[in-house]
Amino acid sequence: MRMEYTSSQFFTIFTAIVFGSIQAGNVFNFVPDISNASNAGTSMFALLDQKPQIDIQSNEGTVLHECQGHVQFENVGFEYPTRPGAPVLRGINMDIPPGSYCALVGSSGCGKSTTIQLMERFYDVSSGRILLDGHDIRTLNLASLRKHIALVSQEPTLYDGTIEFNLRLGALENPDDVTETQLKEAARSANILDFIEGLPEGFRTQVGSKGTQLSGGQKQRLAIARALIRNPKILLLDEATSALDSDSEKIVQKALDAAATGRTTIAIAHRLATIAHADCIFAFHQGVISEAGNHQTLLQQNGIYANLVTLQALEKH
């Protein structure tokens, strides 16, 4: 059957074909972008599907119900996975008795912070082993290990919310289970309870984004209180007072000394006056421990530690 079209119909069809061809041509301009987006999506999902070598959600490993806080490093060596062949730590040996105060000192980049990261199992050692109460920490359940350890770093992280909200985050499991008594006890140990109770809203006071409503010393003492919420047996201090002015440092240092009581404490210190009372001081140099002893012993050796003390004394003048 032969069909006939009017000129109007012909023009409509012709116009549709022309404009359709133009739009189809425009689509091809986006082909490179579509290809790039597809490749990026593939890479992103491959990354999301990766399982960490150290999985905090894993149920594997021995659960350490009770912890004395005896820490031992046995011939520990470490190099970062991204820098193979460049050892950061070599042959590290430390025996830190329960309840003792130990300090790590040395120049920047000598391996002090890496030592603390290994203790928390952010990484696993490349050689040797780290023991907690005689257990290789790699054999312990990770959540169980971190339950007994708390870290106070140089730059405390506070979240937009109340003081109470930020303190409850220190609980390893359910923050809602933290009692008011526990909150007050942690704040008292961190030497900040009087300050909190003097505020109109008390523990419900808003701290602002990143704690902008608080001073540096107040933020640091809140971080100490948060670390104590879980009542850890091991306290790690990574230059916890180095970013503070001298007045705030004295207040925070008093809080740290109180928090360290009855706990195994490993402190990284830039200002050596804050760790002169330590039971043992380990002086790091280029990834190895070059000296170990108390303040007086190391001064008499007239080595790296004595040199650091002299330099800081000169800086004050």
Q: In which residue ranges do the predicted regions lie?
A:
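An intracellular "coupling" helix at the cytosolic face of ABC transporter transmembrane type-1 domains
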Residues: 1-4, 22, 26-36, 53, ...
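Membrane-water interface of transmembrane alpha-helices in multipass transporters/channels
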Residues: 3-15
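Cytosolic ends of transmembrane helices, especially the final helix of ABC transmembrane type-1 domains
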Residues: 13, 17-47
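Amphipathic, soluble alpha-helical interaction motifs
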Residues: 23, 30, 47-50, 278, ...
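Conserved E/DxxT/N motif and adjacent residues on the DHp alpha2 helix
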Residues: 46, 53, 168
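Pre-NBD coupling/linker segments of ABC/ABC-like ATPases
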Residues: 53-66
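ABC-type nucleotide-binding domain
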Residues: 64-317
